[in-house]
Design a protein with these regions (language model features):
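Tyrosine-centered aromatic motifs in long, intrinsically disordered, low-complexity repeat arrays
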Residues: 4-7, 58-59, 64-65, 70-71, ...
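Short Gly/Ser/Thr- and charged-rich N-terminal loops/segments
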Residues: 14, 23, 36-40, 48, ...
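Cationic, amphipathic, low-complexity segments that mediate targeting or membrane/lipid association
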Residues: 1-10, 15-21
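Hydrophobic alpha-helical targeting segments used for export or membrane insertion
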Residues: 25-35
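Short, Lys/Arg-enriched N-terminal segments with co-localized hydrophobic residues
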Residues: 82-94
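Structural preference for beta-rich elements and adjacent junctions enriched in aromatics
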Residues: 94-312
Length: 312
């Protein structure tokens, strides 16, 4: 039976639950004084956190409207169940977390195709991009994973995909989201401006930046050329192949690719981010995310549902 620790927030009651390794399993949280201490601090976006028993309780008045979130350091999952008395409904807010391992740039292979082996040697774990948030409309769920590392001045992404059909017709700054596409959205500077870095299975990509979905600025060709890309399917465009395929992609994204900011180093930063897999024009259309999205229809431009990405 689920046991909740409730506290009154005026018009809302929030209940903290534990999401164990992706399984919707509620566990009792005997946080006691930790809850009071976290609430007293009233930190913004993870500040003012108090630890006890491997759990971290934080009271965030800004981003969650006065909700309590608990982060389990072992499973790296967060779940906050909120009951809005006014709307008389329950809303689950989940914030996952990835810790990106720092790898000395001198240890990174010159050949991008050798980077997966380097990440293996460094023990960098995969994270499932497996949340099918709209299963009724789009039931197909390919197997997709990503792992993240960094060199201080660049983010290293390695995607691994198994799907029933693949396509790569778009070119750089084209409609890559209509192909077999992996996407990385992030807020690198904490100012509300987020970037969408989208890349199809042939390494053709686009980068957009802005504070909202409309009127986004596209990165110039010169910026795209700074992002190193490797795909196990090659770099040439191809029409849809309706046959099961397994493919991998590596992206090395320099800080300069975040063209609306001047980011010196990622080391020690914690940012908000989400990872996606889509294929708008594929026979098996799908929309998957790493961190869950609670919206009625597919929409990846939703920073309120980003998880956390911390760079060692």
């Amino acid at each position: 039976m689920a046991e909740f620790l409730k506290f009154n927030l005026g018009q809302k009651f929030c209940a903290v639950s534990h999401l164990a390794c992706g399984r919707a399993k509620f566990l009792p949280l005997l946080l006691g004084a930790c809850l009071a201490a976290g609430a007293a601090e009233g930190g913004h976006d993870g500040s003012g956190l108090t630890e006890c028993g491997g759990l971290t309780a934080g009271f965030d008045q800004t981003e969650r409207g006065g909700q309590l979130a608990c982060f389990d350091q072992t499973t790296r999952c967060v779940s906050t169940a909120c009951f809005d008395q006014t709307a008389n409904r329950k809303k689950d807010v989940v914030m996952k977390k990835i810790i990106a391992k720092h790898i000395d740039a001198t240890k990174m292979p010159a050949e991008l195709s050798d980077i997966p082996a380097r990440l293996d040697a460094e023990g960098v774990a995969y994270n499932a991009i497996g949340c099918n948030n709209w299963p009724e409309a789009f039931p197909y769920t390919p197997k997709v994973e990503v792992r993240v590392a960094h060199t201080g001045d660049a983010i290293v992404l390695h995607y691994r995909v198994e799907e029933s059909t693949v396509q790569a017709e778009a070119e750089d700054n084209g409609k890559v989201w209509e192909d077999s596409c992996c996407e990385f959205f992030s807020i690198p500077a904490g100012d509300g401006v987020y970037y969408n870095i989208e890349c199809n299975c042939a390494g053709q990509m686009l980068i957009g930046g802005g504070a909202e979905r409309k009127n986004r600025e596209r990165a110039a060709k010169e910026v795209l050329e700074t992002v190193k890309r490797w795909s196990s399917l090659g770099r040439e465009p191809f029409a849809e192949k309706a046959a099961p395929a397994s493919w991998q992609m590596v992206m090395v994204i320099p800080a300069s690719a975040f063209f609306k900011h001047h980011i010196g180093s990622f080391t020690g930063k914690t940012i908000r981010a989400n990872f996606y897999k889509c294929g708008d024009r594929l026979k098996q259309q799908h929309y998957l995310s790493w961190n869950p999205i609670d919206l009625p229809r597919p929409n990846f431009h939703c920073p309120e549902f980003f998880g956390e990405l911390t760079f060692e």
